[in-house]
UniProtKB/Swiss-Prot annotation:
Keywords, alphabetical: Methylation, Ribonucleoprotein, Ribosomal protein, RNA-binding, rRNA-binding, tRNA-binding
GO biological process: translation
UniProt keyword Ribosomal protein, yes or no: yes
Protein name per the record: Small ribosomal subunit protein uS12
Residue numbers bearing the 3-methylthioaspartic acid modification: 89
GO molecular function annotations of the record: rRNA binding; structural constituent of ribosome; tRNA binding
Assembly and oligomerization: Part of the 30S ribosomal subunit. Contacts proteins S8 and S17. May interact with IF1 in the 30S initiation complex.
Length: 124
């Protein structure tokens, strides 16, 4: 506990919180161009081929983003929108591709949880 004298001499130091998504530079989403689209394997107890892409953002940052959902149409030079959100079993992947925005199509034949995968309501 500080004395009043100490508080008069030195004010309290604010805790500085570090951003989990620095490349977004305080924006909710950022646009970028795919420089490489590839698959990678997850950390130890899990096994799969996760679809990821390397993205050069409009602010100059180069980041790795995860492509969620079954199947995608991304290739080099595709223009995409990314959001924050890490993938726990892929080290270094802190961003997600937003499906259904710009060049990235929504997931085909998706019926449930459509809003997360850029799919319109099915006409009956």
């Amino acid at each position: 506990m500080s004395t009043i004298n100490q508080l008069v001499r030195f004010s309290r130091v604010r805790k500085v919180t570090k951003s989990n998504v620095p490349a977004l530079s305080k924006c909710p989403q950022k646009r970028g161009v795919c420089t490489r689209v590839y698959t990678t394997t997850p950390k130890k107890p899990n096994s799969a081929l996760r679809k990821v892409c390397r993205v050069r953002l409009t602010n100059g940052h180069e980041v790795t983003a995860y492509i969620g959902g079954e199947g995608h149409n991304l290739q080099e030079h595709s223009v995409i929108l990314i959001r924050g959100g890490r993938v726990k079993d892929l080290p270094g992947v802190r961003y997600h591709v937003i499906r259904g925005a710009l060049d990235c199509s929504g997931v085909k034949d998706r019926k449930k949880g459509r809003s997360k995968y850029g799919v319109k309501k099915l006409k009956v």
